[in-house]
Amino acid sequence: MEINLTSKLRFVFQSDADRKSAYDTLIAYRDACNYVSQYVFYNDFVLRQSELQSALYHELRKRFGLKSQMTQSVFKTVIARYKTVQTQLRKQRVWDGYKKDNHGKDVPNYIHKDLTFLWKPIEFKRPQLDLVRNLITASKIMCYL
C-alpha cells in the first residue's frame, strides 16, 4: 500500500534577508519549470525523466542555481503537468471531416486530442516549490510527526 503525505506549510521568517532568499528560490524553481516546459514543447513532448535529465540537468543547475533534489523535482513537476493536460485532452473529441464506412457512406470522423493540439508551452505562473522525497525519508518524517 502506498501512502502519500502532502503538507502545506506557512513559514515565518526571522529577517527580510531570509524571506528574500526563500522567495528567490521559489522564483528560480518556477523559472526552471518554465525552461523545461519550453524544452518539452519544442522537442516533440519528451516526457521521460531520463531523457530530460541527460539533456538539461547540468544546464539547470548552472543557470538557475538549483540543488540536485530541486532539479530532479523540476523534471517531475513538468512531466506531471504535461501528463495531466494529456489526460484532459484525451477526453475531448474533435471533428476531422468525413470518412467512408463499409457501405461507402460518408460518416463523421472524430479524433481525440493529444499534446500536439497545444499552441504554446505550459506556463508556470506562481512562485512554487515542490520537493518530492523518497518513500524511506517520507516514512521517517511521518514517524516523527
Show which residues each predicted segment covers.
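Nucleic-acid substrate recognition interfaces
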Residues: 1-145
